[in-house]
Amino acid sequence: MPILQVIVLAVVQGLTEFLPISSTAHLYLTSWLLGWQIEGLDFDIALHIGTLLAVLIFFARDWLQIIAQGFGIRREGDRELNHNHMLLWLLLIGTVPVGIAGLLFNKQAEGAWRNPFVMGFMLIVVGVLMWIAENAGRQQRDLSSLDLADTLAIGTAQALAVVPGTSRSGVTITAGLFRSLTRESAARFSFLLSTPAIGAAAAKAIWDMHKKGGGLHGMLHADFLVGVAVSAITGCIVIAWFLHYLRRNGLRPFVYYRILFGIIVLALAFIRRPA
């Protein structure tokens, strides 16, 4: 794969994985419109590892505190996390629905559903739900008050992200708003919840490569390393910017973008069918 293509797609992944606008749709449609082929599991692994590194690096202190408190070890840190010692177990429970959905619908997600008609439809539907949540949610709670019901609701929403065009961050932030979390807390929990899911996706891709006769040594080439680095750096920048943005701003620009982008995707799908 040409290095320019690697960089462009890795930037697209890093930008769109953590914004509520669907990384899958943007990667697929960028490649489709530019006539590029995303070849090989190694590149898919690179993007997954890059975005996994982004959340692990950015939330490293949070994860250390969450894990320590989950095992009864007192660790001073973030105020919200200090008041919720069950967060580790809530995050693990919240990951179960997407794991089940991935096992049940992986073939559809990688096959029949991966087309611009499905993506355009889901971009619009989740955009409308995000608009409703933005206006209906009370946005009064933070992570200190998160409970099992919240986790199950947000975790179940994350399971919908197996459908391309949904956006993992978009649907989980929307669910968080419906549970009356503040925008920033909903996004923060969304990113923390994404960590096990992204890690599992990377592990599955590595296992699939192993079954096809590949190995880790085959991934350690320039394209792979550039893809990991670019998507990780871009992802860290986007997470920092987005959390800062949500402290004072709402999600309406992303709602409008999703709906407009969804309409454009559907229009292009009718005009020009993908190969």
From Swiss-Prot:
GO terms for cellular component: plasma membrane. It catalyses: di-trans,octa-cis-undecaprenyl diphosphate + H2O = di-trans,octa-cis-undecaprenyl phosphate + phosphate + H(+). GO terms for molecular function: undecaprenyl-diphosphatase activity. It is a multi-pass membrane protein. This is Undecaprenyl-diphosphatase. Belongs to the UppP family. Catalyzes the dephosphorylation of undecaprenyl diphosphate (UPP). Confers resistance to bacitracin. Its EC number is 3.6.1.27. Its main location: membrane. It holds the Pfam family BacA. The keyword Aminoacyl-tRNA synthetase does not apply. Bacitracin is thought to be involved in the inhibition of peptidoglycan synthesis by sequestering undecaprenyl diphosphate, thereby reducing the pool of lipid carrier available. The chain crosses the membrane at residues 1-21, 40-60, 85-105, 117-137, 189-209, 224-244, 251-271. It comes from Solibacter usitatus (strain Ellin6076). Keywords: Antibiotic resistance, Cell inner membrane, Cell membrane, Cell shape, Cell wall biogenesis/degradation, Hydrolase, Membrane, Peptidoglycan synthesis, Transmembrane, Transmembrane helix. One of its GO terms (biological process) is cell wall organization. It is found in: Cell inner membrane.
